[in-house]
Amino acid sequence: RLSEDPNVSILLLEAGGTDRKFKISMPLGFLSTILDPKLGWGYMGEPEPHLNHRPLWLPRGKVLGGSSSINGMFYMRGHPNDYDTWAQMGARGWSYDDVLPYFRKMEDSWRGENHYHGTGGPLRVEPIQTRHLLHEPLKQAVLAAGYPDTDDISGAQAEGPALGELTIDRNGRRASAAAAYIRPALGRRNLEVRLESQARRVLFDGQRARGVEYQRGGQVRQVRARREVILGGGVYNSPQLLMLSGIGPAEHLTERGLSVKVDSPGVGRNISEHPCCMMEFAAARPVTFVRELRFDRAARHFLQWLALGTGKFATQLNSCNIILRTDRKLAQPDIQLMSNPVTFSAKVWMPPFTKTPEHKFACGVVVLNQRSRGWLELRSADPLDTPAVTLNIMDDEWDRATMIRGIREARRIYRTSPQAELTGTELLPGAEVQSDDELEAWVREVCEIGQHA
């Protein structure tokens, strides 16, 4: 967007390489991209104090487009109360009414133009094609369990069982930041993109940022900015880069042998991430997406996507995006259920060489408005060293209690008709895990993150 102004010149430094890869473009390829070490930073967190001291996997994209090139493409706004709370806390200009016009301007929504959605923007938003993903049984079960209906989580009713939405273009390709914003601008003479160029620190003249030191091909280089330096490294790399540049908690910087430019204790603090526990249920009948992963069918789906940009590999695997208030006294929802007609461990199978996989449902229970907060520190003054990240997941008792309520509600919904007729044995955490103490112990053992920090 900056390059729309012909009076400015822009240099974009990207630590990773090109995003022009089949598995990035193909929506169902996200199951592979997020695991590919060539496309990510390979971050592992520090031992989590409230998760049995387990380190958490922290996937972040190291490729043009960043994490938007490897993520699940799920499109969903925060609840209006989130933005209004920011404004009430002093972030003027960030209320829901303030940001809604920018959401609308950004979108090219399949829903068309209305009060909540826009058309003609750079980011195409499409519905998940759910006819083969068992959306309707889950939706009806949620309604039968007493929750309100909605057809648009990002619209007037931000609560209930909704059709999931994805950032996918009209040709069935991932609409990442690279595809939607950067690539269309590459023909502009005032924009240069340098790949495999990792920023090391910000350069200063006095107290003013004047450039960036970066590393490319084993060589350390410097570039000077005529106007400004913008950090876009995300939740982990931006604070790391600030601290490497001398901006952060003075005591910590001194311990790492860095000169203090600005003592800013908040840098690297107050990291917020959604806790997520993955439940699994056996399917009572062979109805899950595992059917479509049989080799001959998977090959046909891939070729259909490649030739036409359509079919079952041109979408994602979410059956229903369920947003709930487990306590009606709450001002806004506290739980998201990411319901899928297959587990993420499912793979392409070829009879008779591989055994027919079990049919399973997966349900990610996600705590919204979590209260636990984490932090990030430098391991060393080496810019190529990874940051030390402690998310402090489940530190707050409210988060633990909310997760347990969410697990109980997921159980109730999957045992409510018509979904109940499709649901077999509970596999994770297992029907024998019933008390709050037992559920909390399971949460500490298996809880991961929503990758939304």
Which role fits each region the language model picked out?
Residues E4-L11, G16-K21, M26, V202, ...:
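Glycine-rich loop(s) and the adjacent beta-strand/alpha-helix scaffold that form part
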Residues L100, M106-Q157, A162-G164, V287, ...:
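FAD-dependent oxidoreductase catalytic-site/capping-region signature
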Residues R1-K105, D263-G266, H274-A283:
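N-terminal glycine-rich phosphate/pyrophosphate-binding loop and immediately adjacent elements
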Residues F22-K23, P80-Q88, F204, G374-L376, ...:
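Cytochrome P450 core scaffold surrounding the K-helix E-X-X-R motif
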Residues R20, H50, A87-A209, E213-Q215, ...:
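Conserved redox-cofactor binding core of oxidoreductases
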Residues D5, R188-R189, T416-S417:
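Acidic-histidine catalytic/liganding microenvironments
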Residues G45-N52, V63, E213-Q219, L324-L330, ...:
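Short acidic, glycine-rich loop/turn motifs
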